[in-house]
């Protein structure tokens, strides 16, 4: 399951290069996430009216839904600079201090994967976010003293796929917290048509809708599928993405009508065939698939849970009736009786 997946929500190098040209610049261009966008629009207008920076903002949700894009839009709407970094990239307190001291008034510091900040870094970030001050230790031993350096007022925008891993003190310092949801097919259709115009791709509404329907509710995936179908249309067809062209291309990519690929189906089959439908522990499931536990939780599970193909229980993962039906496997009715035998077959 380690080969590159066309439906993975995580960004590859090609995605990062292309996404820069496809990202919206303003809130008016941002498609989907209507509730979040409206709340942020009000926050921006209020902050501008008071002449203050935005409240510290936390964006969370599955990967590929536009957290980084939204941070860039907020910076553009506020007319300020944005500095991009990530939790793993800030290894020492000095790294964070260098970032903070280079910020100008009202600037935005965007920290992706903020849940991966280590605790020592968080201790430096707390007073910076709360008091706009940086505490620096000068000297060593008994003569060491703390020096407080004032910082210009700024905004931290944090992004995470794992809200539960944030410590309470860090989470409490964000005045604005927003969850990004999976996109509707209609919203993804609009994204396909917009991206096709930017990339100079001739795409029919029917072809765009077919791509949108298989994109797992994720803009990053819909843009990647658009590029793959474009390549197919250019080589096999006449360069136009029609309904038939889109279906043929996506079939060759092994992306079915719900957006599942061979890796998703293999995961579901493992639960059904190797573990009798579950429950199976996460680490056991990951080992059987030669996958990382984090990849199962962050990449595979969110969409399968959204479809209702998977259940998380205290005893492990269970494949639902819908998963059996999608794979064309006869469903085995089961009961779970406090550790007693499971998997009873009912006639």
Swiss-Prot record:
Positions of DNA binding: 312, 317
Amino-acid positions noted as binding Mg(2+) in the UniProt annotation, renumbered to this chain: 68
Head domain (RuvB-H): annotated segments: 257-347
Subunit structure, as described in the record: Homohexamer. Forms an RuvA(8)-RuvB(12)-Holliday junction (HJ) complex. HJ DNA is sandwiched between 2 RuvA tetramers; dsDNA enters through RuvA and exits via RuvB. An RuvB hexamer assembles on each DNA strand where it exits the tetramer. Each RuvB hexamer is contacted by two RuvA subunits (via domain III) on 2 adjacent RuvB subunits; this complex drives branch migration. In the full resolvosome a probable DNA-RuvA(4)-RuvB(12)-RuvC(2) complex forms which resolves the HJ.
Molecular function per GO: ATP binding; ATP hydrolysis activity; four-way junction DNA binding; four-way junction helicase activity
Signal peptide span: none
CC per GO annotation: cytoplasm; Holliday junction resolvase complex
Major location category of this protein: cytoplasm
Record protein name field: Holliday junction branch migration complex subunit RuvB
Native organism: Roseiflexus sp. (strain RS-1)
Catalytic activity: ATP + H2O = ADP + phosphate + H(+)
Domain description: Has 3 domains, the large (RuvB-L) and small ATPase (RuvB-S) domains and the C-terminal head (RuvB-H) domain. The head domain binds DNA, while the ATPase domains jointly bind ATP, ADP or are empty depending on the state of the subunit in the translocation cycle. During a single DNA translocation step the structure of each domain remains the same, but their relative positions change.
Entry keyword set: ATP-binding, Cytoplasm, DNA damage, DNA recombination, DNA repair, DNA-binding, Hydrolase, Nucleotide-binding
EC number: 3.6.4.-
Protein's cellular compartments: Cytoplasm
Ranges for region Large ATPase domain (RuvB-L): 1-183
UniProt family annotation: Belongs to the RuvB family.
